[in-house]
Amino acid sequence: MHKHHNGLKTAALFGVLWAVLLALGALIGAGTRSSAPIWIMALVGVGTTFYGYWNSDKIAIRSMQAFEVSEAQAPQLYQIVRELSARANQPMPRIYVSPTMNPNAFATGRNPQNAAVCCTEGILQLLDARELRGVLGHELMHVYNRDILTSSVAAAVAGVITSVGQMLLFFGGGDRRNANPLAMIAMALLAPFAASLIQMAISRTREYDADEDGSQLTGDPLALASALAKIERGVTMVPLPPDQRLVNASHLMIANPFRGGAMNKLFATHPPMRDRIARLERMAGRPLQ
């Protein structure tokens, strides 16, 4: 039920995102003689996003300074990932470890054949084997559900809207006989803001799905709930610096790796941790002890 609802919500959010783009395009068509520079920038935005999608594993791993580990170096990680991959009838991903003490994990790659799973030193020290299994189930489901593609398409559309909005502010001075200048300025400013909010909402919806699907894969929702509770406390103690490379990769992680704040919550790529834990408790039919 939750998964069906989240799928409809994701589709609806994509619909709103495209509606914002079409409204912006219609306004440009009514108010400018030529929109060529705008659409050139839009294509650049799409191309950049496609590059990011195709190389998502390399970009995220590089941003976290992660290194690939062998089974001899990380036997527990290999054992858990091999078991869950076999259970899902999917190929074994590459396994990486990041030296940061921020307790986090992520999976990336454009498909299961090109997937990579990364755990930080912080999360490996913080969680027990059962909790780590819950986290890895969540991360693997992001790959199996093609969430990298979903987030890339959302980023592409949001990027187009932002590029068009910026170009409209600078180059929107053509023939305005059929346009309302105030409406054009308002749309140029508000459309990127709205697109970012929608993009973040899509990301939060996919997190809920990965929680649910990952718990079904492991058969242990409370293991993930316990892990999330520990991770929330650990991230507060050891937040990552808001470096732009880390910000760009943060939507892949199981928890927001930065220190919280009012604006961070508004643009959060992850749902509130208490809501995620409550959903997992309902799946298990009992509260987390």
UniProtKB/Swiss-Prot annotation:
GO terms for cellular component: plasma membrane. Keywords: Cell membrane, Hydrolase, Membrane, Metal-binding, Metalloprotease, Protease, Transmembrane, Transmembrane helix, Zinc. It is a multi-pass membrane protein. The keyword Protein biosynthesis does not apply. The chain crosses the membrane at residues 11-31, 36-54, 153-173, 182-202. The active site is at E139. Binds 1 zinc ion per subunit. Pfam families: Peptidase_M48. Its cofactor is Zn(2+). GO terms for biological process: proteolysis. Its EC number is 3.4.24.-. Zn(2+) binds at H138, H142, E207. This is Protease HtpX homolog. It comes from Pseudarthrobacter chlorophenolicus (strain ATCC 700700 / DSM 12829 / CIP 107037 / JCM 12360 / KCTC 9906 / NCIMB 13794 / A6) (Arthrobacter chlorophenolicus). The gene is htpX.
